[in-house]
Amino acid sequence: PAFDRWAQNIGELRSTTPTVLFGWCGWMLVILPLLLGLRFRRDRVTVGLVFLALIVATAGLTLHHARWGYFVALFCAMAVPWALAAQRRRWLAWMVFVVSLWPVAREWDHALYPTDAAWRARAENVADAVALRDAAIRLRRLPEGGVMAPWWFCPAIVWWSGQSCIGGSSHQSLPGIVDSCEFYLSESLEKTDAILTSHQIRYVFAYEPARMISNSAQILGRQPISTPLAEPLFRHPKSSSARLESIYANRYFKVLGVRAGQGL
């Protein structure tokens, strides 16, 4: 159950829609099977049938999991010359091809000229990334130890700090992801102490609590308590526990050290 709930946060594991597929492949996604079928009927070219089967299969898989989108786009691009050859009038084939790219052009237009809301979201993501790097590199010269952090930040923290993290963005990190969610949602110091000890955690990252609490609650499938640990760790890091010491803080992140031989 935890895997299914966690997978909802991973873009490539989500289902997609025909509109998204058209943004990747254009309207050729609909036209190609028709042209490939026509080409096979007229010339008996089996390659067209192979492309037809691959496009239909990968398009269906992409509707289930977006990670298959790379393949459907690749097969569509490879099949275009074979499919357009079914139309003997080249000018018509080219016109169909160019017009079919309209959804792709619209997608690029949205990417290059985002709305105000999309632009603000991008700016926030960039600011998050800069602040995370600034916080993570502070651990480079510190003693080696495990890092407790929101799971989606763990790969970047490992890269910039050289320290090991409890979680990651892979399903193989799921046990650590679940434990990190338990940690940030918990109010039981005994339980968090057990998590820190079992993973040999030496450093704790605190981040904007609303996102951490909502994501942890979603993955664990339960409602958070009134004041989860994520809240005091970020709002009042120095007073959240006598066993924690402040190492570094910026606008978005707080880095706390677990005193040697102690948990929370």
Locations of regions flagged by a protein language model:
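Alpha-helical transmembrane segments at the extracellular/periplasmic loop-to-helix junctions
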Residues: 1-41, 45-52
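Alpha-helical transmembrane segments
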Residues: 24-28, 50, 74, 91-95, ...
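Transmembrane alpha-helices and membrane-interface helical segments
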Residues: 29-39, 52-64, 72-90
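Short secondary-structure boundary/capping elements
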Residues: 44, 51-52, 63, 127-131
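Helicase P-loop NTPase motor core of nucleic-acid translocases
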Residues: 45-47, 55-59, 246, 252
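Signature aromatic-anchored transmembrane alpha helix within multi-pass, membrane-resident enzymes
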Residues: 78, 84-111
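Extracytoplasmic
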Residues: 102-264
